Amino acid sequence: MKKLLFASDYQEGAHPKIIQRLAETNLMQSFGYGMDEICESARERIRAACGCREAEVHFLVGGTQTNATVIDALLQSYEGVIAPDSGHVSLHEAGAIEAGGHKVLTIPHEFGKISAKAVEEYCKEYEQDLNHEHMVKPGMVYISQPTEYGTIYSLKELEALSRVCRENNLPLYVDGARLAYALACKQNDVSLKDLARLCDVFYIGGTKCGAMLGEAVVIPKPGRIPHFFTIIKQHGGLMAKGRILGIQFDVLFENKLYETIGQGALAAADKIRACLAASDYMLDFDSPTNQIFVSLNDSEVKLLAECVEFSFWEKLDSGRTVVRLATSWATSDEDVERLTEVLKKMESSLDGSGEQQ
């Protein structure tokens, strides 16, 4: 039997409406590098959704390129970026930020999030250190919505972070690789308009949220990053056939598709969580979006790996392993049903100690 793929949320292609629009416009001639009419239409739709008519909107090819480009553009050579120690730029971008000449200044996370208080304390400690001229200066703050742990910042938390960042002259940058799943979450109270109001730069994820590829960077205040187009090209994030990206975001922001596309993923994740709880598996913590983290013993990991592709997350001091299961906008009811059947069979094949009978 073919393995079930729950390792990530970018294992499918693109939403059918995007494929249809790409096919319809395939032979259309247009200007390059995002200067075409479709990209401009997408920009206008995004500006309207963000309630920010003057915002700059730039289309880049992928998440790591986007983070590396934005962070390098916002920082001076002597500055680093404050980020949670669990952040994507901290762990899973192969040193892309450091390769660009900037240090990632990590703060301990709490379920993927960092607080305004922690950022404020970091800045105070830097200033109070008499040797701070010999140190990397904190120059901006990076967070993601949702976080790497699938948790989300509340509006109150984001407002507090924004306030501390502005008090300390630190640009606030939000990585929205999975933003559609936060927007679709029932517990979420942060809108695109809130992001535009509270952040200096943020990006709207496409790759993990229904697009074939691509991310849309939003800079609410035009001119905040001078010559950003050129900087994008320097970092290899600019597509000559830019309309390929524009078409996808034009579709995603037509009739509010982006704000609803994550609903199916969240419903699927909730079904999986319910099955795990009913079968007495140990959820590592509560994540309200499309990522599920479950703690397994070695026997359970081995059995699950026979039928399901999942992501290793971390090894606990207890010897148990935390694995991640991720749903996406395209996760089918059939695959969810098959996964729950696998989980139930695993439970029945193990004795009370969690070992295989």
Predicted regions: what they are:
Residues 76-78, 270-271, 275-351, 357:
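Conserved C-terminal alpha-helix-loop-beta "cap" of PLP-dependent enzymes
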Residues 15-63, 85-86, 90, 96, ...:
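Conserved N-terminal alpha-helix of the aminotransferase class I/II PLP-enzyme fold
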Residues 73-91, 120:
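Conserved PLP-anchoring active-site segment centered on the Schiff-base-forming lysine
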Residues 104-105, 172-174, 283, 310:
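Hydrophobic beta-strand scaffold residues
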Residues 101-139, 143-146, 153-160:
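PLP-dependent aminotransferase-class I/II
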Residues 111, 137-138, 144, 152, ...:
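Active-site C-terminal subdomain of aminotransferase-like
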Residues 153-185:
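Catalytic PLP-binding core of fold-type I/II PLP enzymes
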